[in-house]
């Protein structure tokens, strides 16, 4: 039986109203009651996640910022990685050929120089919001990650620019089709979950994980059982063909899977099909 379950949030647990569905909440509480450690692994900020979980009655370990931070259930930091100061300065001062908005995440919040209220819709449950700033007002140290937000095609073109200019100094991933992230080199949910597992005297083989986007790839591929959402990005399904595909997020596919798994933990096939 797996001893830890790690869940992505957007596209995996969160419904279109950006809340966890009632059936899924029930399944997660049952999982915790069965002695499985809950872990929420997300690109969202720690402050955002605490707001979401406070409305759900759930508690668990947090992997936030796509692996840049790991905290215990009380919010105590266990692990963290930041972007190098010189890379932050380079990204902020380079005139990239793009219309994408740029967002920088630090322990004290989410910062941007562009006011786009539509971006706050996904954070209505938690009340988390961006802080408008001039880039030269922020320290170059203590920065977790960058996010660029635009159409997918524009971000594909921007990613090519970033990779050409920065080479192997950072990692890049699409956490959604319209969100390109720049992360510290070697930082991802899989590495963060490995650090957490070691802290808990577990191995990745003791873990199951659920996800839908490319920022879930390393986590899903390294755990004892990785489950891909039915609504996952096509690229994720293509790159992890060996993993089971379960139901869609809007159908609360995680709950459906967990209800079957809790009654038959040694099930070797996905009950979705």
UniProtKB/Swiss-Prot annotation:
Family (UniProt): Belongs to the HAD-like hydrolase superfamily. Cof family.
MF terms (GO), sorted A to Z: 4-amino-5-hydroxymethyl-2-methylpyrimidine diphosphatase activity; magnesium ion binding; phosphatase activity
Binding site for Mg(2+): 8, 10, 212
Stated name of the protein: HMP-PP phosphatase
EC class name: hydrolase
Function per UniProt: Catalyzes the hydrolysis of 4-amino-2-methyl-5-hydroxymethylpyrimidine pyrophosphate (HMP-PP) to 4-amino-2-methyl-5-hydroxymethylpyrimidine phosphate (HMP-P).
Cofactor: Mg(2+)
Positions annotated as active site in the UniProt record: 8
Gene from which this protein is expressed: cof
PANTHER family (alphabetical): HMP-PP PHOSPHATASE, PTHR47267
Enzyme Commission number(s) of this protein: 3.6.1.-
Catalytic activity as recorded in UniProt: 4-amino-2-methyl-5-(diphosphooxymethyl)pyrimidine + H2O = 4-amino-2-methyl-5-(phosphooxymethyl)pyrimidine + phosphate + H(+)
UniProt entry keywords in alphabetical sequence: Hydrolase, Magnesium, Metal-binding
Top-rank taxon, per record: Bacteria
